[in-house]
Curated annotation (Swiss-Prot):
Residue span, Helicase ATP-binding domain: 26-183
Designated name of the protein: UvrABC system protein B
GO BP: any one term: SOS response
Broad class of the protein's primary localization: cytoplasm
InterPro entries linked to this entry: Helicase/UvrB_N (IPR006935), Helicase_ATP-bd (IPR014001), Helicase_C-like (IPR001650), P-loop_NTPase (IPR027417), UVR_dom (IPR001943), UVR_dom_sf (IPR036876), UvrB (IPR004807), UvrB_inter (IPR041471)
Reported function: The UvrABC repair system catalyzes the recognition and processing of DNA lesions. A damage recognition complex composed of 2 UvrA and 2 UvrB subunits scans DNA for abnormalities. Upon binding of the UvrA(2)B(2) complex to a putative damaged site, the DNA wraps around one UvrB monomer. DNA wrap is dependent on ATP binding by UvrB and probably causes local melting of the DNA helix, facilitating insertion of UvrB beta-hairpin between the DNA strands. Then UvrB probes one DNA strand for the presence of a lesion.
Motif Beta-hairpin, residue numbers: 92-115
Family to which this protein belongs: Belongs to the UvrB family.
A GO CC term assigned to this protein in UniProt: excinuclease repair complex
Naturally occurring in which organism (per UniProt): Shigella flexneri serotype 5b (strain 8401)
Entry-linked NCBIfam families: PRK05298.1, uvrb
Length: 673
């Protein structure tokens, strides 16, 4: 049930925030299609957007460039709007190998994927909220531009149950089977139902902690109640309930029958073309594969790889855009593109890569030409579908600036009064020794340093050099997985080491108030890693510390360096002026380490309502030294499974803690063995 958006925050807008909120709201009310919010690091961009949403009361989609930032935004929005529907929509694949064919080696690679059940449930919850409520905020990744089930067909397939309605038990079971729910009287889990006499228990696909009990008397629905599927305890009785399909790709029977006829027609036309071109192998392969899929669809209502026939199933013409999450967003919805300088180019690049792979499959008879229409949106289609949009970035790209007509909403002044870092340019010749002395100064006063290099080799050599000179240093690179990366950042903040060396990982989304110095080596080498936007983003990592400073090592000033330094000085000047006028003394951020690492941990926290206390993890210190190796090995296996579960649920901090415990347990195991 919809409620008005209610913003929950102990803070009131300050600094540049009130003016930014006013200008954005005025622009939206005046019908501006595109606006850009240029918000520096630490200026509270998310809080500004939350205020705009609360004031205008409009359903909103927030696009983030990756899962980690999406999880961070989800966590923040959840805190701002605890009473409203804040949802999370990202790719549900933990692992995905798309179908592909390599002609040079005559190798066909079957589609292989591992689906994260919890994220699948959250995706279903997101679309349900968008169809049912007005007070909805969906935080999504670029997964939002990929094909999804048609919302019209999805709505047609819903099963409405109300107390007092006349319906036969077998009719309910038949409808549940059409929604792809499976009967399972033993293991009651998401997307299943069980039958006990005249009682049907249904575990909705979009829920993780509430199930529905339907009690029938003869052919009448006598009672509907929600209960905890774990304990069986009744939570509440309700007058009505709507059951949504188990997946977004459910299609009514009549639509499937019609689609099958259209597929047969396309197959006949394609066979003719292949035979005319003397492609006998391709013709045989295509006929065999397509007929097998048609038989599966006829018998079961779906087949493996059914998304390749999505054009027929959604009733769209050749070349028309596929249905996506944007089709679920109400007409007056609002789109917020976070870190737009990264997200917008991502959207533009998705279509071409997907098409190149599928054209090969079509050419060699693995798929019908209609498979090309199972694709992400083209950039022009995204532009046509996008509602009123706010682009949010510290370094907006040319596209956003052009679309906004150069009229950018500035949010440069931070509520804390913190200034942008002081920038110095120093010569390359002595960069390593100069850096070493700067590191020692910072380490002496318990502050941290980030160093960014151009190549992996240089990062490794620099790390080794600093270690030889007694510095506590770690190296962050692309081979490190997400959990370990978060652990490294946490350890830096906790003071386990003083210097973090990286290449291109020290940019968007890393908030480390303890970092007072950012050193950029070879800053005068113009290119992607030393562009104006890259430099501003990297310099911004020191903007959360009162003593923030950035040193650019370069023998000459490139155009990118000049622009980055000029922009930083413009911001610093404006911030200083505001502080003087309002008597503000800059204050450092005392953000708890856990706050930054809890990236959307609300996503998968098991609700303990009525379930008793959760079983504590065994601390290695409490493990008896005489514990048998076999028992230790069993405990290690248990914790490994738990660690992977936390990692899949984006609970990075818990995963890192278990990892530390595993390390100690393994040492005990070796000693015991």
């Amino acid at each position: 049930m919809s409620k008005p958006f209610k913003l929950n925050s102990a803070f009131k807008p300050s600094g540049d925030q009130p003016e930014a909120i006013r200008r954005l709201e005025e622009g939206l009310e005046d019908g501006l299609a595109h606006q850009t919010l240029l918000g520096v690091t630490g200026s509270g961009k998310t809080f500004t957007i939350a205020n705009v949403i609360a004031d205008l009361q409009r359903p909103t989609m927030v696009l983030a460039p990756n899962k980690t930032l999406a999880a961070q935004l989800y966590g923040e929005m959840k805190e701002f709007f605890p009473e409203n529907a804040v949802e999370y929509f990202v790719s549900y694949y933990d692992y995905y190998q798309p179908e592909a064919y390599v002609p040079s080696s005559d190798t066909f690679i079957e589609k292989d994927a591992s689906v994260n059940e919890h994220i699948e449930q959250m995706r279903l919850s997101a679309t349900k909220a968008m169809l049912e409520r007005r007070d909805v905020i969906v935080v999504a990744s670029v997964s939002a531009i990929y094909g999804l089930g048609d919302p019209d067909l999805y709505l047609k397939m819903m099963l409405h149950l109300t107390v007092g309605m006349i319906i036969d038990q077998r009719a309910i079971l038949r409808r549940l089977a059409e929604l792809q729910y499976a009967r399972n009287d033993q293991a009651f889990q998401r997307g299943t139902f069980r039958v006990r006499g005249e009682v049907i228990d249904i575990f909705p696909a979009e829920s993780d902690d509430i199930a529905l009990r339907v009690e029938l008397f003869d052919e009448e629905v006598e009672r509907l109640s929600l209960f905890d599927p774990l304990t069986g305890q009744i939570v509440s009785t309700i007058p009505r309930f709507t059951i949504y399909p188990k997946t977004h790709y459910v299609t009514p029977r009549e639509r499937i029958v019609q689609a099958m006829e259209e597929i047969k027609e396309e197959l006949a036309a394609r066979r003719k073309v292949l035979l005319e071109n003397n492609k006998l192998l391709e013709e045989q392969r295509l006929t065999q594969r397509t007929q097998f899929d048609l038989e599966m669809m006829d018998e079961l209502g779906y087949c493996s790889g059914i998304e390749n026939y999505s054009r027929f199933l959604s009733g769209r013409g050749p070349g028309e855009p596929p249905p996506t999450l944007f089709d679920y967003l109400p007409a007056d919805g609002l789109l917020v593109v976070d870190e737009s300088h990264v997200t917008i180019p991502q959207i533009g690049g998705m279509y071409r890569g997907d098409r190149a792979r599928k054209e090969t499959l079509v050419e060699y008879g693995f798929r019908l030409p209609s498979a090309l229409d199972n694709r992400p949106l083209k950039f022009e289609e995204f532009e046509a579908l996008a509602p009123q949009t706010i682009y949010v970035s510290a370094t907006p790209g040319n596209y956003e600036l052009e679309k906004s007509g150069g009229d950018v909403v500035d949010q440069v002044v931070r509520p804390t009064g913190l200034l942008d870092p002081i920038i110095e340019v120093r010569p390359v010749a002595t960069q390593v020794d100069d850096l070493l002395s700067e590191i020692r100064q910072r380490a002496a006063i318990n502050e941290r340093v980030l160093v960014t290099t151009l190549t992996k080799r240089m990062a490794e050599d620099l790390t080794e050099y600093l270690e030889e000179h007694g510095e506590r240093v770690r190296y962050l690179h692309s081979d490190i997985d997400t959990v370990e990366r978060m652990e490294i950042i946490r350890d830096l903040r906790l003071g386990e080491f003083d210097v973090l060396v990286g290449i291109n990982l020290l940019r968007e989304g890393l908030d480390m108030p303890e970092v007072s110095l950012v050193a950029i080596l070879d800053a005068d080498k113009e290119g992607f890693l030393r562009s104006e936007r890259s430099l501003i983003q990297t310099i911004g990592r020191a903007a959360r510390n009162v003593n923030g400073k950035a040193i650019l090592y370069g023998d000459r000033s490139t155009p990118s360096m000049a622009k980055a330094i000029g922009e930083t000085e413009r911001r610093r000047e404006k911030q200083q002026k505001y502080n003087e006028e309002h008597g503000i003394t800059p204050q450092g951020l005392n953000k708890k380490v856990v706050d930054i690492l809890a990236l959307g941990q609300n996503i998968a926290k098991t609700k303990a309502k009525g379930r008793g206390k959760s079983r504590p993890i065994v601390e290695p210190d409490n493990v008896p030294m005489d514990m048998l190796p076999k028992a230790l090995q069993q405990k290690i296996h248990e914790l490994e499974g738990l660690m992977m579960q936390h990692a899949q649920n984006l609970e990075f901090e818990e995963a890192a803690q278990i990892r530390d415990q595993l390390h100690q347990l393994r040492e005990l195991f070796i000693a015991a063995s």
